[in-house]
């Protein structure tokens, strides 16, 4: 059985850890509140913008967009969103798992034909360990999502796609649903996927009774870059909110575990102390009777 001093030292150590996890939970919770507000304000706009574009591209209009062209996939770009720091449960591990699965599906293309755009320090480090060369560093976008930085990344991807330097772009990120639920998604970014248009229940029907000026072609040409830039920005906001939610939950669990451990150690301390007092009394009684 451990001595009183050892048990007391361990109690103090766990109490110190509990203070840290509790403080981290409060910080993460405050950041989550801010990030949640940002994503909840942005998602309706992004979805509506995307629906308007989908309606135009699926309508019987004599317009074709180069961003919708399907071609054999010879070169692919993968944009994966993670966090810059750890202590957020399985958040980063799940991103890495899906990333490895995605890379495995394109392995036959060769490593040189798989371009990785890591958004976040953790996925960037993992990409380097796997032997890939990251196409830039986007740690700032993961920590503090900025529309300008997201738009710059979107512009780069669009240019590469138009120049046929890449044939497909995929996104891997967490979609924030609630503090307890963050859904990991893998979506095709380019070419634009119009398959959702085939499902009436999901899209609620195509509305194409728009008055278009100056022309549908010009409107679509202006709208697509905005939609694609907005998609990257929304994914960054989604991932950021999911990260803070995962960290808040992880720190809450850690704090609860610390409380339980402190209770167990306190019981052990009291039991050990009581045993020591009993032994001392027995020694005193035994000595007086000798």
From Swiss-Prot:
Keyword terms, alphabetized: ATP synthesis, Cell inner membrane, Cell membrane, CF(1), Hydrogen ion transport, Ion transport, Membrane, Transport
The organism's place on the tree of life at top rank: Bacteria
GO MF annotation terms: ATP binding; proton-transporting ATP synthase activity, rotational mechanism
GO cellular component terms, semicolon-separated: plasma membrane; proton-transporting ATP synthase complex
InterPro entries in the record: ATP_synth_F1_ATPase_gsu, ATP_synth_F1_gsu
Disulphides: none
One Pfam match: ATP-synt
Membrane topology note: Peripheral membrane protein
Cellular compartments annotated: Cell inner membrane
Any GO BP annotation: proton motive force-driven plasma membrane ATP synthesis
Keyword Transport set for record: yes
Purpose: Produces ATP from ADP in the presence of a proton gradient across the membrane. The gamma chain is believed to be important in regulating ATPase activity and the flow of protons through the CF(0) complex.
Family: Belongs to the ATPase gamma chain family.
Known partners and oligomeric status: F-type ATPases have 2 components, CF(1) - the catalytic core - and CF(0) - the membrane proton channel. CF(1) has five subunits: alpha(3), beta(3), gamma(1), delta(1), epsilon(1). CF(0) has three main subunits: a, b and c.
HAMAP family: ATP_synth_gamma_bact (MF_00815)
Protein name according to UniProt: ATP synthase gamma chain
Protein species of origin: Bacteroides fragilis (strain YCH46)
Lineage: Bacteria, Pseudomonadati, Bacteroidota, Bacteroidia, Bacteroidales
């Amino acid at each position: 059985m451990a001595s009183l001093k050892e048990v007391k030292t361990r109690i103090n150590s766990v109490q110190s850890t509990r203070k840290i996890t509790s403080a981290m939970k409060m910080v993460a919770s405050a950041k989550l509140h801010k990030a949640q507000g940002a994503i909840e304000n942005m998602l309706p706009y992004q979805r509506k913008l995307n629906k308007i574009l989908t309606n135009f591209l699926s309508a019987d209009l004599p317009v074709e967009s180069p961003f919708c062209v399907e071609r054999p996939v010879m070169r692919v770009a993968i944009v994966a969103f993670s966090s810059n720091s750890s202590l957020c449960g399985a958040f980063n591990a799940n991103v890495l798992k899906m990333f490895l699965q995605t890379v495995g599906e394109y392995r036959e293309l060769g490593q040189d034909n798989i371009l990785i755009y890591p958004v976040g320090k953790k996925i960037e480090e993992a990409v380097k360990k796997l032997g890939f060369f990251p196409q830039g560093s986007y740690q700032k976008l993961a920590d503090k999502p900025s529309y300008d930085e997201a738009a710059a990344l979107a512009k780069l991807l669009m240019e590469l796609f138009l120049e046929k330097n890449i044939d497909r772009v995929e996104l891997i990120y967490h979609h924030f649903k609630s503090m307890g639920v963050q859904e990991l998604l893998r979506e095709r970014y380019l070419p634009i996927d119009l398959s959702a248009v085939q499902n009436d229940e999901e899209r609620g029907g195509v509305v194409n009774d728009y008055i278009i000026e100056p022309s549908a072609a010009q409107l679509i040409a202006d709208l697509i870059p905005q939609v694609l830039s907005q998609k990257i920005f929304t994914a960054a906001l989604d991932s950021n909110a999911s990260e803070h939610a995962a960290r808040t939950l992880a720190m809450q669990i850690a704090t609860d575990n610390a409380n339980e451990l402190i209770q167990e150690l306190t019981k052990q301390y009291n039991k050990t102390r009581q045993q020591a007092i009993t032994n001392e009394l027995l020694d005193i009684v035994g000595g007086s009777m000798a």
